[in-house]
Amino acid sequence: MELNTFISRLFSAAEAAGIAPAEAACSQSDSFRVRVRRGELEDYQVSENAGLTLRGRVNGRIGTASTQALTEESIPLLIQGVLESAALIETDEQDDILPPDNSYASVCNDSEAVTALTAEQKIALAREIDEKLRSDDPRLTPDTCAVATGEETFTLKNTLGLDLSHHSNMIYAMANVVARDGEHAATDYETRWGYGLDAIDAETLAESCKRESLMKLEAGRMKSGAYPVVIKNSAMGDLLATFCGVFSADNVQKGPVSYTHLTLPTTERV
């Protein structure tokens, strides 16, 4: 069923069941992925997915229900799911259903260049990366490379007048090389992404992957102690990603939470 028609019928059924206001969030996505390993096309995947979540207020509580089938048969199941889940809610801390704001900031993260790419172009890029991964250095062995694209349309509507939709897409490529020297072995995994073929240079990606894997061959263990260090930007990014939850005000407010890494009173501004 066409999405707007489905949501319209869903809201009518929700109103008849005493669910007001009601809100529907829907994600529709397409993805493509090809993987090449040492000259051979190893994997090829094309998929389409859709998912819709209905939220609605019932007796002061907001219930939710989800489906992946936008069919007439799904509507009563969603309504029943919202009614049942709302009856189980015990907390007053819920994200409310709100009317639309006067305006919204524009975010552009899609490109016609990605949509226009053919499967043949993506496969050709993957094969080119695989070719560039090969090296005269006997220590280096190409492993795998992949090229993928993804597109998503996200729609958010409610019975208070909100009606928003956003389309996004991207292309990304990854390469993996194994380096061996005697008993030492290392691997490197590099990725690039953007909004068109011009964002991914096969040679640059492959050379970076080979260079980084060779650098890791020199790594070794160190005795415990205090050392001056220089941290690579990508390593610092991984470190911050691991511990970012420690700095979450939301997590602190939900307490009691004990963070051994960060002990601050919740009233102190930092």
Annotated model-derived regions:
Residues 261-270:
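Single conserved hydrophobic/aromatic residue that forms the stacking wall/gate
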Residues 1-262:
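Active-site bordering "gate/hinge" segments
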